[in-house]
Design a protein with these regions (language model features):
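Structured loop/turn residues at beta-strand edges in well-structured enzyme cores
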Residues: 65, 200, 389
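A conserved helix-loop-beta module that forms one wall/lid of the active-site cleft
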Residues: 195-207
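Short, glycine/charge-rich flexible loops or terminal/linker lids adjacent to PRPP-binding catalytic cores
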Residues: 97, 213-218
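N-terminal glycine/serine-rich phosphate-binding loop of ATP-dependent small-molecule kinases
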Residues: 1-91, 102, 220-221, 225-233, ...
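Active-site core segments that coordinate phosphate-bearing ligands/cofactors
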Residues: 5-6, 15-18, 101, 108-124, ...
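Short glycine/proline- and charge-enriched loop/turn segments
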Residues: 32-36, 172, 279-280
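Short beta-strand-loop/turn "lid" adjacent to the catalytic site in phosphate-handling enzymes
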Residues: 62-95, 120-128, 159-180, 204-208, ...
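A generic structural motif
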Residues: 30-32, 95, 293
Length: 437
């Protein structure tokens, strides 16, 4: 019998899995939901996402009923405000949202940049730290928040709707911009006051492996699961992957996908203005993270725009060739790799080509994208070293199915060993052992 029913909820789909430790016994087909992009906005309909969760679980069939607990791994931030009945007053606003630049500036200016970093562990990055989103709604849609009884991230929403509990974990709390991330000792009165909100509408923070609550009868009927089934509080998807990688101090975990996320595990967090610092979610460990917001998505954007007649296999072959060969002699084209903005900056940069001439070819443009991305990947290592945690030389790598990880690690200085891990988020959930509060 599977011990855990795992739910991996990303920015476009939900996968449910039956887990026995780190073994995946079965997985559902992906249940997709739509993220609405409008300018700098990125929103998900909460009811549509909840329906996708139910679809994924039911995709496992009768076996899903024979588990001991449910465990969650979610995208983050995914901010939402709820009323007294647990109904959403706002859309779920995801980490891809960039509408709140002005609000981010205001939060940092009022409290001071150094003070915010020292309290929260991060600067108030638009969308990446959800206090900026909360500030935007307070200013632009105050009516939506007048009846707010609970405000949190996706795991809080799921618990409120499925178990009736009001909980979150330290990894999610870290990215609210309101939590004492570096000490893990609760919500910060100073940060809440800076935003102008009350701690009363915030969830209780407990470790990710703590049972947040049991499924209500209504939720059990909707999901096809037993009423009362324990649901763990859950954690961020990247934390689940780090657990599978070992979560040892100095461990690097690199998720190479549409976004490229490089995380360092530490027991002594040292905030840096160009890094995201957050709790692991269990125990007293933290992750310090550097992110390229558009990695594979930048390459496949180039395929759609410049090489629409090429097959995927031909395109990937050319990526490898260009990576080995480098730019042609005399080529002056350069690429700034910010097609999806920058996760660790308040002022949002944009992607750009420079050095174009009448001799520039589409191959030059693709080569420039590769060079810009590989350089940006390598430039993250000095930032992580600056935290004072010694980096282990074996890097756990997830999401490298297209072998883009080899491309992205090309310019890393020194000797490294790369250890592929598959299904990292789902398998990491299987390592959480349920415990009572």
């Amino acid at each position: 019998m599977a011990a855990v029913l795992g739910l991996d909820i990303g920015s476009s789909s939900v996968i449910a899995g039956l887990l026995d430790g780190r073994r995946v016994l079965a997985e559902s087909p992906r249940a997709f939901f739509r993220t609405r992009h409008d300018g700098g906005r990125a929103e998900v309909d909460p009811e549509v996402l909840l329906a996708a969760v139910a679809t994924a679980i039911r995709g496992l069939g009768e076996r899903a009923r024979r588990v001991d607990a449910v465990a969650l791994a979610t995208m983050c931030p995914a901010w939402v405000a709820l009323d007294r009945d647990g109904k959403a007053l706002t859309p779920i606003v995801t980490h891809q949202d960039r509408r709140s630049v002005a609000e981010a500036r205001g939060l940092e200016e009022r409290i001071g940049a150094d003070r915010h970093l020292a309290l929260c562990g991060c600067r108030p990055f638009p969308g990446g730290i959800s206090s900026t989103t909360w500030a935007w709604f307070r200013k632009h849609q105050p009516g939506a928040l007048r009846r707010a009884d609970l405000v949190g991230h996706l795991n809080t929403f799921l618990h409120r709707r499925l178990t009736g509990s009001r909980v979150t974990d330290p990894s999610n709390a870290s990215f609210t911009g309101l939590y004492r991330t570096l000490t893990l000792d609760g919500w910060s009165e100073e940060l809440c006051a800076n935003l102008g909100v009350s701690e009363k509408v915030l969830p209780e923070v407990v470790d990710a492996d703590v049972i947040g609550g049991g499924l209500t009868r209504e939720a059990a009927r909707r999901l096809g699961l037993p009423a009362g089934l324990p649901m763990l509080t859950g954690l961020m998807d990247g934390s689940a992957g780090m657990l599978l990688a070992g979560a040892r101090v100095g461990q690097l975990f690199n998720v190479v996908g549409s976004t490229d996320v490089l995380a360092l595990c530490t027991d002594r967090p040292r905030p840096h203005p160009q890094l995201l610092t957050r709790a692991l979610g269990v125990g007293r460990k933290w992750l310090q993270v550097s992110t390229l917001a558009a990695m594979a998505s930048a390459l496949y954007w180039a395929r759609e725009q410049f090489f629409p007649e090429w097959s995927l296999e031909d395109f990937q072959r050319e990526l490898r060739t260009l990576s080995r060969r480098g730019p042609r002699p005399g080529c002056t084209v350069r690429f700034a790799p910010y097609l999806a903005g920058e996760r660790t900056s308040i002022e949002q940069r944009q992607g750009a080509f420079t050095g174009l001439t009448l001799a520039t070819t589409r191959m030059d443009l693709l080569s420039a994208i590769i060079e810009g991305l590989t350089a940006a990947s390598a430039e993250r290592l000095p930032l992580l070293r600056a935290t004072g945690t010694a980096l282990r030389r074996t890097v756990a790598v997830s999401g490298g199915a297209d072998r883009l990880d080899r491309l992205m690690h090309r310019d890393w200085p020194g000797r490294w060993q790369y250890r592929p891990v598959t299904d990292a988020t789902m398998r990491g959930l299987g390592l959480l052992t349920p415990r009572a509060r």
